[in-house]
Amino acid sequence: MSGLTVVFAGTPEFGLSCLDALIQSRHHLKAVYTQPDRPAGRGRKLQESPVKEWAINNQVPVYQPLNFKNQEAIDELSALKPDVMVVIAYGLILPKAVLEIPRLGCINVHASLLPRWRGASPIQHAILHGDAESGVTIMQMDVGLDTGPMLCKATCPVTSSDTAGSLHDKLAKMSVKPLLDVLEALASNSAQFELQNNELATYAGKINKEEARINWHQSAVEIDRKIRAFNPWPVAYTLAEELMLRIHQAKATDIMSTEMPGMVLNIDKNGMLVATNDNALLVEKIQFPGAKVISVRDWLNSGKTQLHTGLMLQ
C-alpha cells in the first residue's frame, strides 16, 4: 500500500509537530499552503508564518494565495493532485471548490472535543469556561464552521494551572498520533466517520484585545480563568491609576473579603491580594508598560510604589 500525496495548509506554530511527523512518515508531503506574509513588530516588516519558515527549512514548496476566490489559485492546487489536504489553523475559509479537489477530501485538526468549541479560539474558551478536559478532533471538512463528520478524538485534562500557551503546546504534541492514524485509515479505505451532534455545539468566537480587561466584579475563579486563558495573548489587564497593569499569573484564594471589588487588600512577597465579587485573588506576576514581566516579590524589592494597599484597580 503506497503512501498518500498530502498537501498541508496551516499558519501558526500549532501545526509544526504534525508537519515534523508528516515529513518523516511514509506519506509524500507535496506542498504547504500558508497565509501571505504580514507586517509585524514595531518596524512593520513583513514576517513569514511559522509554517512557511518550516517549509523553507525543509525544502517543501510553499503557496500563499490571498484567498481561493479566483480560478488561478484553485487550478494551482488542483495541479498538485493531492490525495488529501491536512488543514490545521490555516485561517482561510476553504470554499466547496477547494474541498472537492483532494481525492479523499480535506481533513482538519481542531483543538477541541467537537462539537464543543467550534470556531477560532477553542483553547481559550475551554479554560475560560472551566472545562475539565480538552483535546483534539480530526474531522472531514465541509462548508460549515467545524461541522464535518469526525474521524478521531484524543483527550487530555485541563489543569488548574494551564494557560492557553501550555494547553496549546500539549494539544499540538498530542495531535500527531491521531492525524497519522487517520491518514493510515484513509489510505486503507477503513476510515470510520461519526456525525457531530449539532444540539451539543458551542462556539468559540475570535478573541480580541478589548475582552482582556479584568472585571473585578466577577468571582476570583472566573478572573483566574481569564488570566490563564489570555496568556500568552492578549494578556489580561487592569488599570492602576490610569497605568495599564498586565497580569500574567494569579490564583483564586479562599480568603473572603467585604471590600469593594478591585481594592488591593495586601501586598507582600507572596503576591498582591485583590478583592473580587467573592474571594480574594492573589496576583503573582505583573507587567507595567514598557517593562518586563516581573513577580510581585521582585517588584516589591525594586522599591517602586505604584501599587499599594487600598489602591482601587479598575
Curated annotation (Swiss-Prot):
NCBIfam families: fmt. Pfam families: Formyl_trans_C, Formyl_trans_N. Its EC number is 2.1.2.9. The keyword Protein biosynthesis applies. Belongs to the Fmt family. It is an enzyme of class 2 (transferase). It comes from Legionella pneumophila (strain Corby). It comes from the Bacteria. One of its GO terms (cellular component) is cytosol. PROSITE patterns: GART. Keywords: Protein biosynthesis, Transferase. Attaches a formyl group to the free amino group of methionyl-tRNA(fMet). The formyl group appears to play a dual role in the initiator identity of N-formylmethionyl-tRNA by promoting its recognition by IF2 and preventing the misappropriation of this tRNA by the elongation apparatus. The gene is fmt. This is Methionyl-tRNA formyltransferase. (6S)-5,6,7,8-tetrahydrofolate binds at S112, L113, L114, P115.
